[in-house]
């Protein structure tokens, strides 16, 4: 091999290593998320939740910049029939989290037989029109800033009450809902941490949202501290722990399927399966103290709690030989008492959900890690996906076909009845590691060819 060929080969090799290093850094920035699914002991049936539903992941991230951080969203798309040239987003999102920690997602939960609204207290830099995908339809909303940091939200597809407020309030007459959003604007302890505000309406069929007439609204300054890695975070939430009641039941409030972020306990631990798990507990975010799972059966939500030690270590044990669950599913195993003791089984006679417990039982609380930067990312949301049996495709809204289609697809391995599908959509300006890898290969080849021509 001549000296020129040796130099050529060495240069090409160094370029490959350099590009791979860049790809790995971009991949690591996104981190993984962990998802908790309600798992039932027994087969699927009408009215049950989906079993370890595979979340469809596309190639790109979508981010919306705000004054105080980045809103990470899933299920976004560039609409072919956008309004006034603005892009429309199908969103199921989230809360603001510093980039060195990663992203944490929460489902948007659509209420059934109950009125629910919430506030979004972080201002957008620009008005957006976006879709909100829920159980059986897609609604298009418009966010328009007014004056004094107020916002007007309008449902463009159905009759809704237009509200201006110092924070953002969603009210949809036909499809009442809530979603949760945190911000860096207001602080609870004057330490530059961020807060969360959640407003709850009553359930007396009163169409007006009025704090003075709303028994379930608690605007107290209750603060709860949580920790992301080495960073202390505080939130503002309800201090009384009230729930919204649905017809004939109490304690019916829930946030649906819970997206939570896992954080390694310490760098000394060699077992990467040990995490601190952050989720909702009594209307606030915190380390898993009482693990809450909400089940929907015959339009009745049942709450199950398992008391844990605060800041408990949890081991994620892989699930093996479970046909209802794909890979990357785990059981939660505690460091002291084995598996979570409390679980739910379905009485096959009358369909009621019963509480029972066994330290050796593994049927409850399956969780699934979503490998955002995994080599297996292309196993999600590819051509192997099939159309779900859910009804969102029958949406009567005027939102885009693309968004509706995305909301009704899931992987062929999973049976789903919930139709909340969080798929990463398409946006030409936002990059996920998978797309970087895809586009890097031809770029590498072109660079090598140019080097060969030059020498």
Swiss-Prot record:
Superkingdom of origin organism: Eukaryota
Glycosylated sites: 136, 148, 210, 298, 421, 432
Cellular component aspect of the GO annotation: membrane
Stretches assigned to the Extracellular side: 29-434
Keywords carried by this UniProt record: Glycoprotein, Membrane, Signal, Transmembrane, Transmembrane helix
Signal peptide boundaries: 1-27
Topology within the bilayer: Single-pass type I membrane protein
Region annotated Disordered, chain positions: 383-402
TM spans (from-to): 435-455
Subcellular location: Membrane
Protein known as: Putative uncharacterized transmembrane protein DDB_G0290991
Gene source species: Dictyostelium discoideum
